């Protein structure tokens, strides 16, 4: 499935690009990804996380029938 492949590439590629993996609780299940930061992300990781979110939201805009993005952010 095209949507699944796109989401997988964005998420796995993005998570692999994070510099400080120990700073995150990451849960990946069939059709579900959750990432919780233990502390503030460094500048590099913030850009990576913003890129993941933007990419997923773009996929969602085009394929609303197949994907739903939910964000919870605390500042």
Model regions: which residues?
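N-terminal intrinsically disordered, cationic/polar leader segments
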Residues: 2, 11-75
């Amino acid at each position: 499935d095209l949507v699944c492949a796109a989401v997988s590439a964005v998420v796995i590629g993005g998570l692999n690009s994070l510099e400080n993996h120990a700073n995150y609780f990451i849960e990946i299940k069939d059709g579900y990804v959750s990432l919780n930061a233990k502390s503030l992300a460094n500048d590099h990781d913030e850009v990576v996380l913003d890129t993941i979110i933007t990419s997923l939201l773009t996929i969602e805009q085009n394929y609303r029938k197949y994907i739903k993005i939910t964000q919870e952010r605390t500042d």
